[in-house]
């Protein structure tokens, strides 16, 4: 619960209307009513403003709506996220080690840590202040988890792997499983021991059922601020830069390096031992088989500059007609050749 003036101070916005109105929750513009605050970031929803009964609306400068309290800001979508956090995202009170959890005596737990039933915390594990381990989390020996982390149900972190501060790991993720390393011996495959670790820096979010393999030697590294969607596979010795986005079902093969501020769309596949430069965007379902330079947009399999891919995709639609045309031309050529021979 907060007043509109308080929320304006939080996001650095300007109030138009009654700043003393009390707001209880954030709601979609279609269903927001009295006591709710909503937002409009996409221009196509502006028409809904005239019918809203919300107590306040977050909008960009220049938008007017008589009779509606407005919170004016430069970035309504970012403001929405901050207000949603302020009104809804309250962390539960710390509960310590709950009945049904098993914590090795050698483990070190910081102040205000919560360990839910079904958790297993191994030898010499360190868990930082304010971190919550939800039911069924398993931390192998020598794992380090930083402060104010949320490790959700069923997450497994294998030996010696490290999580920084404020890391969020969604249910079912596996961090530090063996990398896919096998040496052919002429008859079969000899398993290569995977003796490295996974290191995840501060403010990273790992989605549900993500798998991040430990390095064969050294470190599989996820740098600060990166966000990983559900069902992503990151192989051994991969390095992901800062503030990079990996959308669902991305797969990155071993030893590839993705730069800072990159975005890989859903189901992008990256071959091994490649380098993707900073600020690179790759469209969904693309296949990357060679290094990509920084600051460009790519699509397709194999990847090509996005504009070239658009042209190629447009040509694909014409292929049936082109095939028919070529077939007709071939027949005409054959007929002409036959006439020439007959002369």
UniProtKB/Swiss-Prot annotation:
Keyword Nuclease: no
Keywords of the record: Acyltransferase, Lipid A biosynthesis, Lipid biosynthesis, Lipid metabolism, Repeat, Transferase
GO cellular component: membrane
Record: active site: 236 (proton acceptor)
Catalytic activity: a UDP-3-O-[(3R)-3-hydroxyacyl]-alpha-D-glucosamine + a (3R)-hydroxyacyl-[ACP] = a UDP-2-N,3-O-bis[(3R)-3-hydroxyacyl]-alpha-D-glucosamine + holo-[ACP] + H(+)
The UniProt record lists the keyword Lipid metabolism: yes
A GO MF term: N-acyltransferase activity
Source organism superkingdom: Bacteria
GO biological process terms, semicolon-separated: lipid A biosynthetic process
CDD domains linked: LbH_LpxD (cd03352)
UniProt cross-references to Pfam families, sorted A to Z: Hexapep (PF00132), Hexapep_2 (PF14602), LpxD (PF04613)
SUPFAM superfamilies the record matches: Trimeric LpxA-like enzymes
E.C. number(s) listed in UniProt: 2.3.1.191
Listed pathway(s): Bacterial outer membrane biogenesis; LPS lipid A biosynthesis
UniProt record similarity statement: Belongs to the transferase hexapeptide repeat family. LpxD subfamily.
Subunit architecture: Homotrimer.
NCBIfam families: lipid_A_lpxD, PRK00892.1
Function, as annotated: Catalyzes the N-acylation of UDP-3-O-acylglucosamine using 3-hydroxyacyl-ACP as the acyl donor. Is involved in the biosynthesis of lipid A, a phosphorylated glycolipid that anchors the lipopolysaccharide to the outer membrane of the cell.
Protein name: UDP-3-O-acylglucosamine N-acyltransferase
Organism this protein belongs to: Syntrophotalea carbinolica (strain DSM 2380 / NBRC 103641 / GraBd1) (Pelobacter carbinolicus)
Taxonomic path: Bacteria, Pseudomonadati, Thermodesulfobacteriota, Desulfuromonadia, Desulfuromonadales
The encoding gene: lpxD
